[in-house]
Structures are given as structure tokens and as C-alpha cells.
Amino acid sequence: MLQPKRTKFRKMHKGRNRGLAQGTDVSFGTFGLKAVGRGRLTARQIEAARRAMTRAVKRQGKIWIRVFPDKPITEKPLEVRMGKGKGNVEYWVALIQPGKVLYEMDGVPEEVAREAFKLAAAKLPIKTTFVTKTVM
């Protein structure tokens, strides 16, 4: 599972997920899976989509993960009264804005890449689209 090795602070404010995305172009591979919607991906969702893609391409080609879960999400235990401080870190998420390239792939035919990204998109809670590298 993806998570930071060490952080400056253990817990983080909730914050807001506004603004425009960084990393909107396919830069490493030939094909990419781009986010259309806004939301957050947990480390488990990122890993589940990666496994689905890897199985679909039968371990040929190369896959790049362009998102990293660096925001800790805390939860309080069940049946605990409010107050008494912030809860414990339960999982890590990556905040996603529209236009962000989530995954990239190279070394496979386009039909195989499309099918792999379709399987991966089914594991993710946000809308995505298939993109190819634009050659200038």
C-alpha cells in the first residue's frame, strides 16, 4: 500500500479540493487514464486499479502511477463520544482535480491499453477518460 515514509506532522486539516490539476499531460507512457471528475483516491483504490491493469496486460509493457496518497485521514473508533481530540490516522488519500493523469502505460497495443484502463476505472470512485500522448 502506498503511504509516505515519514511526514512533518502526523495529522492534517480536512481542507478543500478546489482548483486546477497539475500533471495533465501524458509524459512517461503513450496512453493514460485521466480524471474527469473531482474527488479523492485512497491508497487501496490506487493499488486495486494497478492490480487490475497489471492482470489485463499480462505483465507486458510498463505502467506508471502518477498519483501518490500523501494526505492522512483520521477516524474515531466506534461508539466514542465527540471531543477528546482528533482521531487516529486510518488511511491515506490523494486529492484529485479534473484533468489529472492518474496512470500511464506503454509497450502495449491501444486496444489492450483501453481494456486495461476500463478495468482500472471500474475500481475508482471518480469518472475517468482514456487519453493518448500528443506529438508536437
From Swiss-Prot:
CDD domains listed in its UniProt record: Ribosomal_L16_L10e
GO cellular component: cytosolic large ribosomal subunit
SUPFAM superfamilies: Ribosomal protein L16p/L10e
Transmembrane segments: none
Keywords: Ribonucleoprotein, Ribosomal protein, RNA-binding, rRNA-binding, tRNA-binding
Keyword RNA-binding: yes
Gene Ontology molecular function: any one: tRNA binding
Domain of life: Bacteria
Gene3D superfamilies assigned: Ribosomal protein L10e/L16 (3.90.1170.10)
Pfam families: Ribosomal_L16 (PF00252)
KW RNA-binding (keyword) present: yes
InterPro entries: Ribosomal_uL16 (IPR047873), Ribosomal_uL16_bact-type (IPR000114), Ribosomal_uL16_CS (IPR020798), Ribosomal_uL16_dom (IPR016180), Ribosomal_uL16_sf (IPR036920)
GO BP, sorted A to Z: translation
Subunit comment: Part of the 50S ribosomal subunit.
Its biological purpose: Binds 23S rRNA and is also seen to make contacts with the A and possibly P site tRNAs.
Family recorded in the similarity comment: Belongs to the universal ribosomal protein uL16 family.
Protein name: Large ribosomal subunit protein uL16
Organism listed in the record: Serratia proteamaculans (strain 568)
Gene that this polypeptide is encoded by: rplP
